């Protein structure tokens, strides 16, 4: 099981945008973990593949066509573009927080309780372990 990080946001990070586009790697001292040549440039997760312990409750909120899409791309040798969006106009993703270190990254989004660390290598590409969506009320 990968390490998990709590999501904590300062008040200024709650501005709403239809998608989130952030450079997550700009560090000259470490080489960017290999994305070039990776078979994965896009990760599309339909509703039935999202890991959620409250699926029956969540499915009442999220329609059958709900999905999360994550796009990856290199901007330059030392920066990586990460885009998180949804094809649904009613789902607006707010600005999140990113942490990246040698060999891994994690991200958070307002409303998510926790995210798991994900390794970035040329062989595994992004292994997104879990994105925990906002949970419906009990």
UniProtKB/Swiss-Prot annotation:
Positions of disulphide bridges: none
Cleavable signal peptide: none
Pfam family, one: PTEN_C2
Domain C2 tensin-type: 1-75
InterPro entries per UniProt: C2_domain_sf (IPR035892), Tensin_C2-dom (IPR014020)
Protein name in the entry: Putative phosphatidylinositol 3,4,5-trisphosphate 3-phosphatase TPTE2P1
